[in-house]
Amino acid sequence: MFFTLIVFLTIISSLATFLLLFGDSPSFRNTPIQKLRNSLLSISRDIFQFYHWLDEKLNGQLLKILNWLVPVGYVMVVTVCFQQFLTHTLPMLSSPGLFRLFTIYFSMVLIYASTILATFSDPGRITTINLKSYPYTPNQLIFFDGKTCSTCHIAKPARSKHCSVCNQCFLLYDHHCVWINNCVGYYNYKWFMLFLISNINMLGYGGWLCYWALTPVSWRKITSTNNANKITGIFLILCSIFIVITTLFTFLHLRYIYLGVTTNELDKWSEIDHLVGLGVLYQIEPSIANENYVERAILDGNAVHISLKDERILIDNNNVKNFKLQLIQSVEDDLVNIYDHGFWNNLIERLKW
């Protein structure tokens, strides 16, 4: 019964994780998979609304506590799994040897070390000191000069964003990770990647060890033999499922590095791609207030061109003759991502020491 329950919960949690991570990708648009993801998000929003209501009643302390449930739960589950592995699975391995024992314990220590570093490191809090060496400038397409955070009331550098969970702005903001209850940004992206790689190593190496521990055992007897076989079989199933999800997620981030974007910027570029698809994005010469691109819109039956920064009307019938307007027909061919310096350079920048 316990074995069946673990397998069932593993499959359900794996499907939910897959839907949340990949259900909105272009390949699944307008399919039942995207509809399932939207339904899951709708249920999640209802739950979060209840939490917010209850949080207000408790003077804002509830969500701070709940935010730590996932990382604390993760560490507890991993610790229990390690204990069970050392107690039941390790003795099943014939003559593990010093090197194998070293790699096993090193993999365990690496999990804890990477989790601590990713959880408690500074993502890139904005200060006057670190702004002096910050290398990114606004591209006047998805990031603009003179932008101010409406919450922090500080100037927003290019590629930065305010996190509603942490209630701070961070440099080179990527996303807020619930697994570490911390944002991923300019200074700690390297620790986030180490966290992912250490989990892939744990799942891959752990799954391989469980497989070899079970090799002498008849597979059809796993669920009916001793406790060690059952636990090792559960570990093998868990490792086989979650290594796929973790690896796909890691390769997704490597793809973002290849493209020269962050998770946050991907949405902004999607908006630009949408404008290009509608045929309303234009490049202008000369620039206006340092803006090189405008969006075509219709106001009172007349065509105007508005700012991408704040939607002010920059060009109308009175001054349109003073500018050269060139329609942007392709994001790939007509626009340049100034933050993309090639995969290896992008990787070095993101893994900044």
Regions flagged by a language model, labelled:
Residues M1-V165, C169-H176, I180-W353:
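Membrane-associated feature with strongest affinity for ZDHHC
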